[in-house]
Structures are given as structure tokens and as C-alpha cells.
Amino acid sequence: TQIRSGKHRASIEFFADRVPKTVQKIRSLLPATVPLCHAKFVGDELMFMIPAVIDPEYLKSSIETGDVLYYPIQQTICLFFGDTIVPFGRGPFNAVGRIVDGSADLRQLAKTIVHQGFQWARFTQSDASAEKTPAPLSERTAEIIAERQTIWQTAPLELENLKSLQKGRAGNAAVRVYAFADAYRNQRNLWLLRDGVKHENITVETAKLLLAPMLREMADRCDIWALSTPGRLFRKAAGPPAEVTNSEELVDLLDELLIYNNRWWLWLDSCIPWFDLDVQLQNGF
């Protein structure tokens, strides 16, 4: 399996014996164009999102150079290519593979991406015979998937409007950061609910009671930042949960909400000049 961006490439060996369900799911998505980002808090790590929520299969207590991890909460594959590794959070970590070639290329890419926000990369698998997972037939999940596919490679129109939106004396910088923080909070809350349903710590009926007001709150916050499309989608999704009758349907819905929200979160992340802001702080702002 390879990840390519421009002239740079890296080869990944996935642990098919340790994480068979993960590998099967990933292969069903390939080939794919993915946003390759720098994990700013961690150090020598690049990561990219895939449109799939996959439960952990193989956990390890620490991270080493060359590790490839999958982070279910934000549907990201994480590539640890260098010696500076500061895990953002405690283990155990969901290990899915190893970098077998191309660490130097990833190091060069990281120097550009850390200031640029992200770069597009091509994620491919030499085995073209992998079966494709059929798309969910639910009308609710189908609409969310369609919206996610629309913004997967094309920046949402609302993102440009956000870059000039002003809120009082705080100006535009605060608008971008607050919108980003809202999306991050949404992701954590959706994941906690999904995790509770998946492991039967929360009943389906209780989860539905929690999800509806959660989605309406998410929609209201989107309206504040003039993000009309996700606001409309979240508000519409707040109605149907009462029709969900079992945990599988609810997890499917939550998975698609997680993927869609996280794609928005990454777009919002890309429009914040994190390192320019940091320079100002270091200069005594």
C-alpha cells in the first residue's frame, strides 16, 4: 500500500493477520484521494483521513518510529516517520501497520505541510481485487454520505465566507478558532455516544434521546458561523433518530455523522494560520 503526494511517496505494510477487519475496510476504499496533514501536537507525524469508522483490533502500549496507527475518533491513519514522537494522549494505541519505505520523503513533505495546512495525496493498493463495501441504503446515511463526498476534495463555499466573517471586536481570527473548536467538540461528543451504544453501555432509546438535542445544538452553532450546509444537515438528522430501531442502524448513522463532521473539522483546521499565530505569541503578544 502506498501514499503519494507529488514526487514523494511512502510504502505501508498493514498487519493483515492482526487487524484483518481494518485491512479489509481500508482496501475497500482504495484507491482514494486523501488530505495529508501534519499532526502539530505530536511531532514527526503525518496523518490523513479516510471515510470509515473502524473499531480497534490490535492495541499497543507505546509508539515507535515507523508505526502506523488508526485513530477511530477522527478516522485518521497516522504515520510516525521520525524520532520526535510525543503522543497526544495516553495509550493503548491502535496499531495497524508499519512504514516500510519512504520515511525521508515523509520528512520532506512534513516541512511543507506544517505551514501549508495540508496537501492532497493518493492512497493506493496494488491488489485491485479487493471487494468494495456496499453503501448504506438508509436515506439518512445516504444524504450524509452525499454531502461528505461533495466536500471531500472541494472546499465548502461557506469556508471562504468564514474567512471574512466578523463577530464584534473579536474579528475574524476568533471566528475561525471558535468554529474549529465547535467541530472538535462535536466529534468528541458524537464519539462518546457512538462508543456507548457500540459497547452496550448506553441503550438505543437513551442514545436517541441524547442525539436529537445534541444535533440541534450542533446546528445552532453552525448557524452562528454562517455554516449553512452542515447546520441544515445536522438539524435534519435530529428528526429521524426516533425511527431508528436497533443499535446497528444507530451506529451506522453516528459513523456517517462522525466522518462528515470530521471532514469539516479538517477544512476548518486548514484555514487557521496556527504557526503565524504562535510567532505573534512568542514575540510577546
Regions found by a protein language model. Give the residues of each.
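N-terminal intrinsically disordered, low-complexity, charge/repeat-rich segments that act as generic
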Residues: 1-8
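Glycine-rich active-site loops that engage anionic ligands at enzyme catalytic sites
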Residues: 14-285
